[in-house]
Amino acid sequence: MSHIDAEIGKLGHNAYIATKVSFTEEMEQISREHSADPHHVMSVIHADRRVKSKEHLRPGLGPYGGKCVPKDTRELINASHTTTLLSAVESVNENAKDSRLIIGTKSAVRQPAENRSL
């Protein structure tokens, strides 16, 4: 591992912790806006094994998708005026989609027609 890898990893580690703390704070605000108990809400979130899994933290997975994750994220954004973190998450995901489309388009264009598959 290079010193640059280690330094970015250390900075990323602290930013990840900050993101988790900020997410919890945002969920507390949303919970209180809707008269929910934030401790119960966080218990529901932590009950899902995927929250503890490292599987979704691998580089190269691309943007999130599926049926429930985008829909439920948008629902929480719409449910509160204080969801700046979740709005940023949605924005990052949209940028990742756009980036993947551009990269995919460029690589397809660079290939000779006879080497491209549909």
Predicted regions and their residues:
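Structural/interface elements that position substrates and couple domains in central-metabolism enzymes
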Residues: 1-118
